[in-house]
Structures are given as structure tokens and as C-alpha cells.
């Protein structure tokens, strides 16, 4: 057995990619996309049929050019999701426009639109997760969406306050960004020499894992944005782990045994949950974490920029 096969024994493996050919190759259970990955796939010229179908859809719906760009962009995200779902048994995560990250009402509206697009194309929407940045507004949107049967993946999660608020809202799944937490500490040379069990990203995810399991929260934890194999190896047993194509390939080539590091059975359960965070408590606690404030803002800016680049590309095509 290789390490990827060992990992699959203890953890649900998810591919973080918009490259359908690689998803076919590595056969993950689930897959995630984001604006950066979608843009990369669009510009690769491998999936022009998805682009062409999306542009035709937008033209058929009509409206002014900006409206058509928005509709084509939404259909591209859904189009990649539809194709990926053909090759996985589980969930696809489709991210909404990051520029909506501070508007609960618009997040809810966009999520409903994307789910309708999936439904109109014959997809079982119980297999679709809507990705939202873990801002207070998006966490509230996820709470509202769950009440109408739409499940969400709260992404760009860096602080324990974000994790607590997501648990309070009973969101379906969170994605703590292990690698980007590590990046921040590396930038300031605060984690050298490297050791996986002192990696700040690994420590952050473990803290969330033990908190959720101790208090019986149902929210699924999916480690994300890994930079090193050692980070993944240290988190074997996490509910889910989403992995880039490069690290998947490395895992598939290693033959060493992987040991389960996170074991729910070893955690003592507590029946009474902590009091839910208020909005002001959430904002204060999140603000206390300089890394989380910087990385959440940076992530939203990057995804917003890539979304705008995709729309510029579509504007020229329409």
C-alpha cells in the first residue's frame, strides 16, 4: 500500500482541483474548487466546451453584457462541478463570488441560484456544497441556507473564533487552512527549524478537532491548503483532507505506513456545549489573531481578483 491508500483508510480524501483529468486519475471521494482553480482551468484551454456552453447559456438568458458575464461565470463554476461529479461518489464544493463575503443576503441569493443551476442540469443537489468565506456574514448565510436544505463549506478559516462561530451555527463543513497558517509564521521566521508537530497550522487544526469532538459538534472538519506531506501525515484521522494534485502524487509514491494521529475514540466527551459567541465576541476574538485577520483578508482579495479576471475574460468572449 502507498501512503495515499493508507490515508484513505482513516480520512476521507478530497481533491482540491478544477482539473478533471487528474480527478479521474486519483479517484477521490469528494472534490473542491475555488475561483483561482476555476480560472486556471479556464485559461488552460482544456475545457473550452464548458466555457462555450456557459457563454451560450448566458446569451440565451439575455440581459445586458454585465448580466451575461455574471450568468456565464456562475454557469462555468457549475459546469466544472457537473463534470467533476461524474467521476467522484461524494460532494463537490462550489465557491460563490468572494466579493459577496460581507453581505449575508447576497450570499444566500447567490447560493440559491447556483443550486438551481445544478438542479436544472439534473444534478442531485444533496451532493453540492456551497463554499463561503468564514466571515460572520457568511456564517450567518450558511445557517440560513441549511434551514432550506442547502449545505455549506466554510472556507478561509484561520482563527479559533471562526471555528467556534461555525460550530455554533451548525454549518455542515469547515476548511481550516493549515498551509496558509504555516505560510504566515514562515514569513516572520517563527517556525524554524521545521517540525510537523509544532507546525502552527497543524496545531490550529488539532485544537479545532479536539474542541468539536469533545463537545459533540456535528460540523465536519476538512483540513486544507497543505504545503508539506508532513502536515498531512500529522493529521491522519481528520474527518476530511483536501489535497493538491502535487501532494496527492507524492503520497501515492510513498510506501511508508501512515499512523492515525487524530482519534475520536480517545477524546473524553462533554455533554454541555459552551455558550454561542455573539457577533461582537466573534469580531473581537478574531481580531485578536493577527495571522487570521491578515490571511482572511488576503484570501478574500485573491479570490475576488481571480473572479474579476474570469469576468474580464468572459466580457471579451461575449
UniProtKB/Swiss-Prot annotation:
Family annotation (SUPFAM superfamilies): Aldolase
Pathway: Carbohydrate degradation; pentose phosphate pathway; D-glyceraldehyde 3-phosphate and beta-D-fructose 6-phosphate from D-ribose 5-phosphate and D-xylulose 5-phosphate (non-oxidative stage): step 2/3
Keywords attached to this entry: Cytoplasm, Pentose shunt, Schiff base, Transferase
Pfam families: TAL_FSA (PF00923)
Any single biological process term in GO: pentose-phosphate shunt
Keyword ATP-binding on entry: no
Catalysis performed (reactions): D-sedoheptulose 7-phosphate + D-glyceraldehyde 3-phosphate = D-erythrose 4-phosphate + beta-D-fructose 6-phosphate
Any one Gene Ontology cellular component term annotated for this protein: cytosol
GO MF annotation, one: transaldolase activity
EC number: 2.2.1.2
Active-site residues annotated for this sequence: 131
Top-level division of the source organism's lineage: Bacteria
InterPro entries (alphabetical): Aldolase_TIM (IPR013785), TAL/FSA (IPR001585), Transaldolase_1 (IPR004730), Transaldolase_AS (IPR018225)
Main location: cytoplasm
PANTHER family assigned to the protein according to its UniProt record, in alphabetical order: TRANSALDOLASE (PTHR10683), TRANSALDOLASE A (PTHR10683:SF16)
Function comment: Transaldolase is important for the balance of metabolites in the pentose-phosphate pathway.
Family membership: Belongs to the transaldolase family. Type 1 subfamily.
Name of protein: Transaldolase
Amino acid at each position: 500500500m502507498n501512503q495515499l491508500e493508507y490515508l484513505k483508510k482513516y480520512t476521507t480524501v478530497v481533491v482540491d482541483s478544477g482539473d478533471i483529468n487528474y480527478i479521474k486519475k486519483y479517484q477521490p471521494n469528494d472534490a473542491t474548487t475555488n475561483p483561482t482553480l476555476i480560472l486556471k482551468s479556464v485559461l488552460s484551454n482544456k475545457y473550452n466546451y464548458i466555457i462555450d456552453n456557459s457563454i451560450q447559456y448566458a446569451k440565451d438568458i439575455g440581459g445586458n453584457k454585465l448580466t451575461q458575464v455574471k450568468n456565464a461565470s456562475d454557469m462555468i463554476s457549475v459546469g466544472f462541478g457537473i463534470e467533476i461529479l461524474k467521476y467522484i461518489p461524494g460532494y463537490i464544493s462550489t465557491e460563490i463570488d468572494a466579493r459577496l463575503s460581507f453581505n449575508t443576503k447576497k450570499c444566500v441569493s447567490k447560493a440559491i441560484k447556483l443550486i438551481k443551476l445544478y438542479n436544472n442540469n439534473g444534478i442531485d443537489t444533496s451532493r453540492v456544497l456551497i463554499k463561503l468565506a468564514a466571515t460572520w456574514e457568511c456564517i450567518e448565510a450558511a445557517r440560513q441556507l441549511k434551514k432550506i436544505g442547502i449545505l455549506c463549506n466554510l472556507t478561509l478559516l484561520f482563527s479559533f473564533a471562526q471555528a467556534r462561530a461555525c460550530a455554533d451555527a451548525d454549518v455542515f463543513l469547515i476548511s481550516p487552512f493549515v498551509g496558509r497558517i504555516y505560510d504566515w509564521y514562515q514569513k516572520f521566521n517563527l517556525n524554524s527549524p521545521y517540525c510537523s508537530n509544532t507546525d502552527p497550522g497543524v496545531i490550529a487544526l488539532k485544537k479545532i478537532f479536539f474542541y468539536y469532538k469533545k463537545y459533540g459538534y456535528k460540523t465536519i472538519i476538512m483540513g486544507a491548503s497543505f504545503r508539506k506531506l508532513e502536515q498531512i501525515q500529522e493529521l491522519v484521522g481528520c474527518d476530511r483532507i483536501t489535497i493538491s494534485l502535487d501532494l496527492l502524487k507524492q503520497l501515492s509514491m510513498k510506501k511508508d505506513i501512515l499512523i492515525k494521529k487524530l482519534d475520536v475514540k480517545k477524546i473524553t466527551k462533554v455533554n454541555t456545549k459552551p455558550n454561542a459567541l455573539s457577533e461582537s465576541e466573534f469580531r473581537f476574538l478574531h481580531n485578536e489573531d493577527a495571522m487570521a485577520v491578515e490571511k482572511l483578508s488576503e484570501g478574500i482579495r485573491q479570490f475576488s481578483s481571480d473572479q474579476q479576471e474570469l469576468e474580464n475574460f468572459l466580457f471579451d468572449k461575449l
